């Protein structure tokens, strides 16, 4: 769903930080 996609994107950004 939309939330899952947003969460996945946030996780990527946090992991790259």
Swiss-Prot record:
Q: Does the keyword Kinase apply?
A: no
The Swiss-Prot or TrEMBL record annotates one GO molecular function as: toxin activity
User: GO CC terms for this protein?
Assistant: extracellular region; host cell postsynaptic membrane
Q: Does the keyword Secreted apply?
A: yes
Residues bearing 4-carboxyglutamate?
Answer: 3-4, 6, 9, 13
Its predominant location is secreted
> Which of UniProt's keywords are assigned here?
Gamma-carboxyglutamic acid, Ion channel impairing toxin, Ionotropic glutamate receptor inhibitor, Neurotoxin, Postsynaptic neurotoxin, Secreted, Toxin
Q: Where in the cell is it found?
A: Secreted
How is expression of this protein distributed across tissues? Expressed by the venom duct.
Its annotated function is as follows: Conantokins inhibit N-methyl-D-aspartate (NMDA) receptors.
Tell me what else is known: The mature peptide does not contain cysteine residue.
Q: What is this protein called?
A: Conantokin-Qu
Source organism:
Conus quercinus (Oak cone)
